[in-house]
Amino acid sequence: MVGFFRSGFSLYLYCLLIVQLMIPAHAGDGGGMHSGIAGLLGDLEQTQWEPTVSGSRQALVLGGRIRIEDCQSYPYHDNSHGTEGFLKLADDLRHGLGQGLSCISGQGPAGSLHPYHERNAERLIDLLNDDSGKILACVEDQTFAYAIAHPAKNPAMSHEVLIDTYRISGFLSRRFERATYRNFFKLSEPLIEDHLTGKPVHFDGLHRYRDLPGLVFHELTHWLGYEHTNLTADVVDLYEVCCFAGSDHIPDDRVNEGFQQRACKILKDAELWDADEATRKQLWHDKGYYRLKREIRRASG
């Protein structure tokens, strides 16, 4: 899909490391943010292989602090090419952070958002730069979402993202009861048997996730403590829709661009983001912003 962010953004990321060298030391906050993002991305270019805790497998470590484990089949569970999956996820992580952090800090094509979001960019950079454990791990058909983020509850626990390579490849889960395949998915008994014992079923209507950098940034945003809701501003969804060309589920670029622009407009609403939590919840309802998520879901089919 094409949204107004995708054109030329790869070139923007390549230039980001160069731009920081051209900004004077006395530049304003924008220069500091450019430098912070570029510094983080530069650190994450440094990779090394280390054994996992059990010692039976290798993990790819980025910047000495972010571990990628069990991702040889990333992005799809039936693709296995040695180290290729690890390196692909590392690239998606860097790309997603570059695009997402630039966007929410007001340095991207959307222009300035409310300062609330620049503070979130700073918080995420600080989190990714600290020494707390951070793990991106891949699983197969073990979640009912494309990916799940687990924020650390205390300093002794790691921040973790589980990416279901089975789910994002668009395959029907094998974790349901036979009656569910028969009654809900309307599969015949022979097809149920083939699905459970052979190659899994892939329907045209099942979504194959495409914007993987956006998915990774979406999950990392959960590490800031945000959860999904429609009772108040869903920060995670707003960031993904505004910063990554709309919803990954909508093939119509024109419709998607409209949703993207609406999300960015919400992120610029000073009245909403200046408010305390209780007032923001009321404004979210009064301004009709809650309708955005519902309309995106309807447009996704």
Predicted segments with their positions:
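Walker B catalytic acidic pair
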Residues: E219
